[in-house]
């Protein structure tokens, strides 16, 4: 049997979720079920950068849920961290996306706006290139959720994937919201379904708990994962080795 390591080494991207100015993780995306890991999101990002992260994923949870925003904190991290960041949460239109890109963010992560208006993705890619625009589909099963996972969208990953590919999207983030922040591990069958629906770069946005989940990503041909609680609590040691 060919070793997993010779097939694929998934990229593990540390996540810093920001709520009320602090670095937190939520259980299944519920803003009222938070665990605070760092009082300073900048210190959280610096922690992962010091351990070798080449990319840090930032999420403005307050903007995603309409409770406020943490843009000043994100701008500070972008300016001071020294490694690229990608930013998602509450980016509802082209102006918001371009403000972040102009501030030096490596790439923007579009969620609800991409579901409601796939043409926005095409516009941003045409203006800034596919390397600076990512779409995140957050779903229960294959049913996509919007507005900080609080509402169903009425559309599925199967419906959206071809529209996004046609728009020129190269990288898709898929989050199983029923697993995010739970340390329950990945649903292999669901990961396989999504992999079949999206042939370009696929990043899993939640559910990785242990090294076995990273191995699962490699086995299913998934290029990486955004990881939060598992590396904060040590069920997965970062940087990841031992594949």
Swiss-Prot record:
Main location: cytoplasm
Active-site residues per Swiss-Prot or TrEMBL entry: 17, 138
Recorded metabolic or biological pathway in which this protein acts: Amino-acid biosynthesis; L-histidine biosynthesis; L-histidine from 5-phospho-alpha-D-ribose 1-diphosphate: step 4/9
GO terms (BP aspect): L-histidine biosynthetic process; L-tryptophan biosynthetic process
GO molecular function: 1-(5-phosphoribosyl)-5-[(5-phosphoribosylamino)methylideneamino]imidazole-4-carboxamide isomerase activity
Cell compartments where the protein resides: Cytoplasm
Pfam families xref list: His_biosynth (PF00977)
Catalytic activity annotation: 1-(5-phospho-beta-D-ribosyl)-5-[(5-phospho-beta-D-ribosylamino)methylideneamino]imidazole-4-carboxamide = 5-[(5-phospho-1-deoxy-D-ribulos-1-ylimino)methylamino]-1-(5-phospho-beta-D-ribosyl)imidazole-4-carboxamide
EC number annotated for this UniProt entry: 5.3.1.16
Gene3D superfamilies (UniProt xref): Aldolase class I
InterPro entries: Aldolase_TIM, His_biosynth, HisA_bact_arch, Isoase_HisA-like, Isoase_HisA-like_bact, RibuloseP-bd_barrel
Source domain of life: Bacteria
Family note: Belongs to the HisA/HisF family.
Protein name: 1-(5-phosphoribosyl)-5-[(5-phosphoribosylamino)methylideneamino] imidazole-4-carboxamide isomerase
